[in-house]
Structure formats: C-alpha cells, structure tokens
Amino acid sequence: KGEDIDIVVGLRESGQLCVNLAMVRGGRHLGDRPLFPVNAGESTVAEAIAAFIRQHYAAHPAPARLIASPLPEEEEGSELGALLAELAGRQVPVVEARSVLHRAWAEMALQNARLAILARNQASAQQEQRLQALQQALELPDTIQRIECFDISHTQGEAAVASCVVYHGNGMKKADYRRFNMRDITPGDDYA
C-alpha cells in the first residue's frame, strides 16, 4: 500500500524516556527519529507521546494517519484529534496498530527506541570513563564539573579570535560557547 503514516512509540527503560517517530511515506519506511524529552520528569509514556504529537505537528505536516503506542488517554486523545484536524485541515486519526503491517512497523519503532536508549546510556558511560581518566591524568582531587577550552586563531597574524567551548555535567553546553575578537595585541607569527 502507498500509505502515509507516522508511528509514534514511547518507551521508559534504564532511566531514560524515549519517544521514537518512525515515518512511512508512500508505503516506504523513511527512517526513525528518537527523541529524549528533557522536561518529561515523572510523566507517563502516554503523556510524553501526547506532548510530542502536540509540538511536532504544530511545526510539521501531519500524515494521513498516526499510529501511537501507547495511545494517549481518551480525553487527551480527543483533544489531540481536534488539534491535528485544525492544523491539517482534515481528520487525522490517532489509532493503535491493528493490521499485521502496522504492528510490525510499531514493533520496529519500539525496538529502535530501545536501541536508542542503549546507545545513549553507553555513550554516557564512556563519557564518564573519559572524564575520570582526565581527572586522574591531571591529578585533580575533585570530580570535574565544568571544563572551558580556549583556542586562539588568526589569519596571517591579523584578526585574532578567541573561541571558548564548554563541557558541563555530562555533555557539551553549546549555549555557553563564546567567541571573542582580540584587539590591541602583538600579531602572531606562526604561519604554519
């Protein structure tokens, strides 16, 4: 079949909540997009799915049908249906997977959410190990909380710029990145 369907599944496992969006267009699976809501707190998986649907389809076109697992609560589901109809200009049914093909897509999306959680947890563990190795190499007595790295660059000795990247907690903190134009300095002479 040449269906246009999005499959939205949620999974809470190993201390992570993942909402995975699988997109099917013209009957072809185009891929998955796992998302990890930052403000989910103690939300249920169904609440996280409902919040994702609200936010995602406010900015992206809705397909002909939306499969959700688990389905949002009944009251929440009717509000979502009305919102999607308003945004799309047509009815967009939010249903559970019933046909064999739809169940297979939903199961694949759930498995991909599980793999995304596993990959995220492994990356976090590796990052923790690297941070401990750095702490030992620098002989720091306390756990590293924040690292700021600066790089000074220039173009043929002119237009010197300092760039700062920041690591905080468990990852890079791009909101704290900075660039500084440097004035009134002796130009560099390393033309390598």
Regions flagged by a language model, labelled:
Residues 1-192:
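Conserved catalytic/ligand-binding micro-motifs in nucleotide and anionic cofactor chemistry
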